[in-house]
């Protein structure tokens, strides 16, 4: 017994021949990006032009694939800054956890998603590649004016409404 399924398939293909294709030609037609699209990681500066990053290492800790590497250094005024800051975009999954974990809004994700390179080692970005001249998405935030600096002449426990630190060795028998 011969069915007519082949005729139905032929008619279906014939109808699709005259319909506009849904495929977008990528380099000529860019896809629509949504406002919260996550792309390349950048390091921002505060309004004074200083680096916002305090090298707290929260971004590297929260990263699920471990693509962020940094080392802390201390400036003459006691301010922490990253001696080096390295992001391996070959491993990055652009989850945005690093942006959420950053207490100073220093690390931000931009909508730049075109990161293709011929060599894999070219996808390892150093601090000078990541640092931008502007403030990014968070404008006017000065972390160092509200936190992070030692008060001259006041040690721990000497500020107003602050209890002195507990001596743990004094609690031992």
UniProtKB/Swiss-Prot annotation:
The record's annotation in PROSITE patterns points to: 4FE4S_FER_1 (PS00198), 4FE4S_FER_2 (PS51379)
Compartments, record wording: Cell inner membrane
Against InterPro entries, the record matches this protein to: 4Fe4S_Fe-S-bd, 4Fe4S_Fe_S_CS, NADH_quinone_OxRdtase_chainI
Summary of subunit composition and partner proteins: NDH-1 is composed of 14 different subunits. Subunits NuoA, H, J, K, L, M, N constitute the membrane sector of the complex.
UniProt domain 4Fe-4S ferredoxin-type: residue ranges? 41-73, 83-112
User: Biased-composition ranges for Basic and acidic residues?
Assistant: 153-163
* Principal subcellular localisation of the protein: membrane
Q: Per UniProt, what is one GO molecular function of this protein?
A: quinone binding
Q: What is this protein called?
A: NADH-quinone oxidoreductase subunit I 2
Could you tell me the gene encoding this protein? nuoI2
Q: What does this protein do?
A: NDH-1 shuttles electrons from NADH, via FMN and iron-sulfur (Fe-S) centers, to quinones in the respiratory chain. The immediate electron acceptor for the enzyme in this species is believed to be ubiquinone. Couples the redox reaction to proton translocation (for every two electrons transferred, four hydrogen ions are translocated across the cytoplasmic membrane), and thus conserves the redox energy in a proton gradient.
**Topology with respect to the bilayer:** Peripheral membrane protein
Q: Which reaction does it catalyse?
A: a quinone + NADH + 5 H(+)(in) = a quinol + NAD(+) + 4 H(+)(out)
Q: Which cofactor does it need?
A: [4Fe-4S] cluster
Residues bound to [4Fe-4S] cluster 2 = 63, 92, 95, 98
- Note one Pfam family from the annotation: Fer4_7
Q: Cite the residue spans of the region called Disordered.
A: 153-173
Q: List the disulfide bonds.
A: none
Keyword annotations of the record: 4Fe-4S, Cell inner membrane, Cell membrane, Iron, Iron-sulfur, Membrane, Metal-binding, NAD, Quinone, Repeat, Translocase, Ubiquinone
């Amino acid at each position: 017994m011969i069915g007519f399924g082949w005729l139905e398939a032929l008619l279906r293909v014939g109808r699709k021949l005259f319909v506009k294709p849904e495929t977008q030609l990528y380099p000529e037609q860019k896809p629509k990006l949504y406002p919260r699209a996550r792309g390349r990681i950048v390091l921002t500066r505060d309004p004074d032009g200083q680096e916002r990053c305090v090298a707290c290492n929260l971004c590297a800790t929260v990263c699920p694939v471990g693509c962020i590497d940094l080392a802390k250094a201390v400036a003459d005024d006691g301010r922490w800054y990253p001696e080096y800051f390295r992001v391996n975009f070959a491993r990055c999954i652009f989850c945005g956890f690093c942006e959420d974990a950053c207490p100073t809004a220093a690390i931000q994700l931009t909508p730049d998603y075109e990161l293709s390179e011929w060599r894999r080692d070219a996808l390892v970005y150093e601090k000078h590649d990541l640092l931008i001249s502007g403030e990014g998405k968070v404008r006017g935030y000065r972390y160092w004016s509200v936190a992070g600096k030692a008060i001259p002449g006041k040690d721990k426990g000497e500020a107003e409404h602050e209890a002195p630190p507990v001596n743990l060795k004094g609690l031992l028998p």
